[in-house]
Amino acid sequence: MNIENLKTKAEADISEYITKKIIELKKKTGKEVTSIQFTAREKMTGLESYDVKINLI
């Protein structure tokens, strides 16, 4: 696979995972997800990961 294909696959996988978690939260809490905020956690060598904040109503 080339880099573009790998990137596209990773984006689709992440999107699918987030969708599953939104559905799971709605079922367990009965509330809607209003927003998801991603804050990058970086090191001197680049992006390490993200902190995630989910808001429900």
From Swiss-Prot:
One GO biological process term: unsaturated fatty acid biosynthetic process
Record GO cellular component, one term: cytosol
Domain of life: Bacteria
Role description: Overexpression increases levels of unsaturated fatty acids and suppresses both the temperature-sensitive fabA6 mutation and cold-sensitive secG null mutation.
Family from the record: Belongs to the gns family.
Protein name: Protein GnsB
Gene behind this protein: gnsB
